A protein has these predicted regions:
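Beta-strand-rich domains and repeat architectures in extracellular enzymes and scaffolds
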Residues: 53-85, 100-112, 149, 261-263
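Short loop/turn segments that connect beta-strands within beta-propeller blades
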Residues: 89-94, 132-136, 172-175, 217-221, ...
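Signature of short aromatic-glycine-proline-rich micro-motifs recurring in repeat-based ectodomains
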Residues: 64, 193, 240-250
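Conserved beta-strand positions in repeat-built beta-propeller and related beta-rich domains
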Residues: 76-80, 118-125, 158-164, 205-209, ...
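C-terminal motif of bacterial Sec signal peptides marking the signal peptidase cleavage site
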Residues: 15-18
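Bacterial signal peptide processing site
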Residues: 20-23
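A short helix->beta-strand "capping" segment at the edge of beta-propeller domains
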Residues: 39-61, 91-96
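Surface loop/turn motifs at the tips and blade-to-blade linkers of beta-strand repeat domains
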Residues: 55-60, 99-104, 140-146, 181-188, ...
């Protein structure tokens, strides 16, 4: 499983900055793709704490890999072989009102919604599945190289992570690479980028096996903010080592921000606070 492979890597790295020996992503070379390096890499990112606004129930059987808010419900992608699903979840109860299961051979990963379609990645199978948003009926699939971790959209393109410091921008019609973003903070790589969410023109990314979310400028790749969620979930509520923070959802209409984790018993609506507030 992903958590066992990367725990030792994580323990040997500085929190958030990552290390140069993270999981390797096969190199892609296409005539159309370009690469964006963080020209703002020396900018000192703003630091944020949090305030809990509300607590919502969450299924402790949901190994959360992707979370999105739309039309008053959560869309959630879960992982683990034999347990991976795509769900529509009632936020008041935490129960799935509709779901589809992936074949046992697939380890589900991040999800995002673009128009009337939902895109779901898989970890190592090199497959992305496309579903009708209303029915959850699978309507297509794409193949890609390397691993799939997180995915989000700016409403036009798709952005995917693979556990390295890179975010790949993809054409939603073909899944082909349009460009690659290298994420940097103070000039150093930020590895282990996991679940992604597009918020206010930025990419927000969970940093796997940490309590931190980094806010990324999608043009330069520079980290412009760090959200520290240490203490959000009580240690006593975590049953396993890999019950880590993973899952960011945002309601642009109300600016409500939601976060959760793998097998957590709650989804938290939070507000950010600046350090010192």
């Amino acid at each position: 499983m992903k958590h066992t492979i990367f725990t030792l890597i994580f323990l040997s790295c500085t929190l958030v900055y990552g290390c140069g020996a993270g999981p390797k992503k096969p190199k892609k070379t296409t005539s159309h793709s370009t690469q964006t390096t963080a020209s703002e890499g020396r900018v000192v990112p703003a630091r944020y704490g949090f305030r809990v606004v509300a607590e919502l129930p969450h299924s402790t059987s949901a190994y959360t890999q992707g979370l999105q808010w739309e039309d008053g419900v959560f869309y959630e992608g879960t992982g683990l072989n034999g347990r991976s699903e795509l769900r529509i979840v009632n936020p008041a109860t935490g129960e799935a009102v509709k779901s589809v299961s992936l074949e046992r051979k697939y380890f589900g990963e991040g999800i995002t919604i673009l128009g009337d379609k939902i895109y779901q990645l898989t970890w190592t199978a090199g497959k992305a599945f496309v579903y009708d948003k209303a029915t959850l009926r699978k309507v297509g699939e794409f193949s890609y190289e390397g691993e799939g971790w997180g995915i989000t959209t700016d409403g036009k393109s798709l952005y995917t992570s693979d556990g390295t410091d890179r975010i790949v921008v993809r054409n939603p019609q073909t899944f082909k690479t349009e460009r690659t973003i290298e994420v940097r903070m103070a000039g150093r790589k930020v590895n282990m980028l996991n679940e992604l969410e597009w918020i206010g023109g930025e990419i927000w990314a969970n940093v796997y096996m940490t309590d931190q979310i980094v806010r990324i400028n999608p043009e330069s790749g520079a980290v412009v903010g760090i959200v520290d969620l240490t203490g959000l979930q009580a240690p006593s509520d975590k049953r396993w080592q890999d019950d880590v923070l993973n899952g960011i959802a945002y309601n642009p209409a109300t600016k409500a921000l939601f976060v959760t984790g793998k097998n957590w018993n709650k989804v938290y609506q939070i507000e950010l606070t600046k350090d010192g507030d």
